[in-house]
Amino acid sequence: MQVSDFHFDLPNELIARYPQPERTASRLLQLTGETGNIQHKGFKDVLDLAESGDLFVFNNTRVIPARIFGRKASGGKIEVLVERILDDKSILAHVRASKSPKPGNELLLGENDDYQAEMIARHDTLFEIRFNSDKTVLEILEEVGHMPLPPYIDRPDEDADKERYQTVYNAKPGAVAAPTAGLHFDDKLMAALKAKGVNFAFVTLHVGAGTFQPVRVDNIDDHHMHSEYVEVPQDVVDAVNATKANGGRIIAVGTTSVRSLESAAQDAVKKGTELVPFFGDTEIFIFPGYEFQLVDVLVTNFHLPESTLIMLVSAFAGYEHTMNAYLQAVDNKYRFFSYGDSMFITRRNNV
């Protein structure tokens, strides 16, 4: 398939630049993968769509204030966007500058030259940077970093984003983009799902800035996914196995939860074992033709045209069903992308 097969026209005004006043106030497009049937609902209806014995799998990554402004000691402004924390003192980052820093260059980061750092090495498009401070990278980012809002939210970050561009169940710092399907869940909805007999499990996938990179090939077979760190611990494996054994559904909240679970499933197939815990990097690329091992239902936001994420949704619900749902969403003025509305999709078998 061609990347252009996943294009759709999106009016600029449908890109959500701010979240709704309440997390659960978003709209929800329900798509039945088998038939392509569409129903228009509100996000609170997730409670009615869930069944006792279902397992909701959430991504508990925490977004770090990953964007830092500063300058080179030799002069010239720079903007640093953390891609990955390497250790307590070092990061791998994207750097925007009129002239890229070279190994050994001193950087002064923070609006008031708060922290000194050194450019250590370049790895393709990424820069390895080491801080010269008693504080850890996370402490420094919390102090001088900005929330890394996606490029299509064309406004500066605000204090409110520190709460709203974060899920209520975040636990493990490391992401530079939110697992956005989870932004719609508040504590009240989580408690109501629990009361209904729904079970929860938490994977970790630290979303990298690569999630916003455009696909730069024409044929999707030629695309190579960026790498992201994943944790699927033993308790998740146990919960998935128990749910399957009892006839419940695995409901992945977000494409990152899908990629985490399916990475673990692929790893088990490769090793010739049952599902086992998975800790490591994944470059899994899910597009039409992929056979899902674990996930039965997907809760996900509306994604960018020609992105790997709309390809994943097309693999899950069927290409025609997905593109038709997106056209209907545009016609019905759903809000798109990170702060936008959501979908509840049941898997189409043998897509």
Curated annotation (Swiss-Prot):
Q: In which pathway does it act?
A: tRNA modification; tRNA-queuosine biosynthesis
Q: What is its EC number?
A: 2.4.99.17
* Catalytic activity from the UniProt record: 7-aminomethyl-7-carbaguanosine(34) in tRNA + S-adenosyl-L-methionine = epoxyqueuosine(34) in tRNA + adenine + L-methionine + 2 H(+)
Which GO cellular component term is one of those annotated?
cytoplasm
**GO MF annotations for this entry?**
S-adenosylmethionine:tRNA ribosyltransferase-isomerase activity
One BP term from GO:
queuosine biosynthetic process
Outline the subunit composition.
Monomer.
As for what it does, the entry says: Transfers and isomerizes the ribose moiety from AdoMet to the 7-aminomethyl group of 7-deazaguanine (preQ1-tRNA) to give epoxyqueuosine (oQ-tRNA).
Q: What is this protein called?
A: S-adenosylmethionine:tRNA ribosyltransferase-isomerase
Q: Which organism is it from?
A: Photobacterium profundum (strain SS9)
